[in-house]
Amino acid sequence: MIILALNCGSSSVKYQLFDWERKEVVAKGMVERVIIGDSFIMHEVPGRETYRKEYECPDHQVAIDLIIRTVVDADHGVLKDINEISAVGHRVVHGGEMFTRSVLIDEKVLDAVKEVQHLAPLHNPPNIAGIEAAQAVLPHVPHVAIFDTAFHQTMPEHAYLYPLPYEWYEKYGVRRYGFHGTSHLYVSKRAAVLLGKTPSECNIITMHIGNGVSHCAIKGGVSVDTSMGLTPLEGAVMGTRCGDIDPAIPAFMMQKENLSAKEIDSILNKKSGVLGVTGRFTDRRDVIEHASNGDHRCKVALDIEAYRLKKYIGTYMAVLGRLDAVVFTAGVGEMGWPIREKTIEGLEGIGIKLDRERNKGAMTRKRESLITTDDSPIKVFVIPTDEELVFTEDVVAILNGTYTDHMNFDYSFARTDFVRK
């Protein structure tokens, strides 16, 4: 059984082909610069050189057509025929309150996703375009939606409601939803295995740190709070997003700079965060390098980011009452040891003892690592995320009729005998 996982962004389409019987990725890649011009595909097959091809993709339909042609290509593909694909799993960023689990996509589901796209105007439209494009190319196979927000639908009312007019929630759905759900799900279940416990026995703080950043407080295996809110703008400092700020700042700056609502929204989402402070970088590797060479703004950007990460650990520790582990994941979380060090140092008083050598050695996306001392009461792990594996397992379980929900389903990666490939 071959499962195709798709993640459609506004100008990119990521994909992965997973062979369920062999339990391994047989191909993965990305089409970049969709719509905006100079498009190209980067196609990776284990054991082969990466294949790159320039091909104009004015829309997601052409991009997905290109992906299908590439995976069945005689020279660069891994499939003999398109009919080898058994099902498609689609990442959908926002499912609103309606979707608490992954679901088979039918007309009713697609209409419901369209109804909540006003809650994620930057993300849901390309997700929808990807679903419709893939259905056109693969009309006879099941398509499954996996929602970023679903994992967080267990949050209690006092955690997801904002202290705003209640009518805004009733009329417009204004509340905290949270994102990166599949990533938080995966690494929290892996952390439970590393702790030698079941997820229901664990209290864990997971920190997904990439260009986008989110934290999750997980109590007994379920999300009870998360840092992103109605949109992915709230929370920690991010690559280009501001995260938590005084809500009066946008109105203040709109008056000072004569900005429209659209312009201020763009600045907060695309020109703030690490980029805003440094003035030129979003890649933390560049920020770390220039900070070490004396660039004050880069140093301040790192200090701000680590300080905010540290604050969320303290906040969520108070929420959980008892903490077993903290997990770093995603690109920066997995590879950025200086940021991890800045975040964790000084937390000995609350039971977190960093092992600096272990932390520096945890610089790979292929290994799970403990970065605290053996006698640290609270453990800190670096766990490479695998959202596509969550997609795949949800799809297969839905096809087999064995899927329940993310809390109770028996994921392979939640077992002690799981081996990451």
From Swiss-Prot:
PROSITE patterns: ACETATE_KINASE_1. Keywords: ATP-binding, Cytoplasm, Kinase, Magnesium, Metal-binding, Nucleotide-binding, Transferase. Mg(2+). Can also accept Mn(2+). GO terms for cellular component: cytoplasm. Mg(2+) binds at residues 7, 387. Its EC number is 2.7.2.1. GO terms for biological process: acetate metabolic process; acetyl-CoA biosynthetic process. Coiled coil: none annotated. It catalyses: acetate + ATP = acetyl phosphate + ADP. Substrate binds at residue 91. CDD domains: ASKHA_NBD_AcK_PK. This is Acetate kinase. It comes from Geobacter sulfurreducens (strain ATCC 51573 / DSM 12127 / PCA). The gene is ackA.
